[in-house]
Amino acid sequence: MAESNKEAIDSARSNVFKESESLEGTCAKIGGYDFNNGIDHSKLLKSMVSTGFQASNLGDAMIITNQMLDWRLSHDEVPENCSEEEKKNRESVKCKIFLGFTSNLISSGVRETICYLTQHRMVDVLVTTTGGIEEDFIKCLASTYKGKFSLPGADLRSKGLNRIGNLIVPNDNYIKFEDWIIPIFDQMLIEQKTQNVLWTPSRMIARLGKEINNETSYLYWAYKNNIPVFCPSITDGSIGDMLYFHSVSNPGPGLVVDIVQDVIAMDNEAVHASPQKTGIIILGGGLPKHHICNANMMRNGADFAVFINTAQEYDGSDSGARPDEAVSWGKISSTGKAVKVHCDATIAFPLLVAETFAVKKEKASKVNGF
């Protein structure tokens, strides 16, 4: 009986204290930032990767983004048929970066972060929804205000106030937007009829970016720096409303916007990226996420990918899909580096930019004496 009891205890002990496989040298040790060392925001951000949970995912996103920014063609093996001139140019060939975001992020203060990236030519291709276009221009004309998520809709409606989460957009903003954009549509229609101009969403967006002529606008900088902005859903939102009112006010063939030419241009951004690698950073989900991923499928997947959103995968939505699902479609390379940060992008993205794009811009400015 005693022997049997000892065997049972030994078995229980063996089960509880199962010997571990060593993780030394293969995994990062968990530990957060020690504020006894003073306040150092850069070190705090660097500590995210070893903090755990979504902080670690954010830290991984910072690492992958820096890999996007640091990559040069010279890092890859030189092909046998490479000429001497091509060898010299390899150091100047950088990763092509696609940035996608949903409209609410332009409604929010993330707009200024995106404006910074376009102003300094840190991204190469932009994709957003219609709200991400119109809200940028509207903010040049009038302000958006901080409210509360709990404000009653009927009360706001009676006051001509529109709610986006905890943001408030006065309806007068859209009246100002109409006053600004309709004369531009008039001129675009004249050019379509007299000069056979073929308008596409990206061409229209560039024209509007030129017309706004405001340095607080990311679309102004995209126009100025020749960064293409794609928006397949251009007939949605307030711009769609304005296109409707403009078209019904102009009998006969009205303003025509050709979306097919833009899907060719968008896919070509990925198809003809080689020998560049491609990196994708997507804030939110929906159309921008799929449009960028689908274009990169044309080249058998992006080499780097960072998703930041709060959507879940359990309903089969593309918005909630993890990077590995995109790998199954060939939208992210099977050898690519990818991470999803489950976080509100208004929190995560400015922090990511602070430890990636902004740091490199500051270092470059010091080197160049600016």
From Swiss-Prot:
<comment type="function">
    <text>Catalyzes the transfer of an aminobutyl unit from spermidine onto putrescine. The resulting polyamine homospermidine is a precursor in the biosynthesis of pyrrolizidine alkaloids.</text>
</comment>
<dbReference type="GO" id="GO:0050514">
    <property type="term" value="F:homospermidine synthase (spermidine-specific) activity"/>
</dbReference>
<dbReference type="InterPro" id="IPR002773">
    <property type="entry name" value="Deoxyhypusine_synthase"/>
</dbReference>
<dbReference type="GO" id="GO:0005737">
    <property type="term" value="C:cytoplasm"/>
</dbReference>
<keyword id="KW-0808">Transferase</keyword>
<dbReference type="Pfam" id="PF01916">
    <property type="entry name" value="DS"/>
</dbReference>
<dbReference type="GO" id="GO:0034038">
    <property type="term" value="F:deoxyhypusine synthase activity"/>
</dbReference>
<comment type="subunit">
    <text>Homotetramer.</text>
</comment>
<comment type="similarity">
    <text>Belongs to the deoxyhypusine synthase family.</text>
</comment>
<dbReference type="InterPro" id="IPR029035">
    <property type="entry name" value="DHS-like_NAD/FAD-binding_dom"/>
</dbReference>
<protein>
    <recommendedName>
        <fullName>Homospermidine synthase 1</fullName>
        <ecNumber>2.5.1.45</ecNumber>
    </recommendedName>
</protein>
<comment type="pathway">
    <text>Alkaloid biosynthesis; pyrrolizidine alkaloid biosynthesis.</text>
</comment>
<dbReference type="InterPro" id="IPR036982">
    <property type="entry name" value="Deoxyhypusine_synthase_sf"/>
</dbReference>
<keyword id="KW-0520">NAD</keyword>
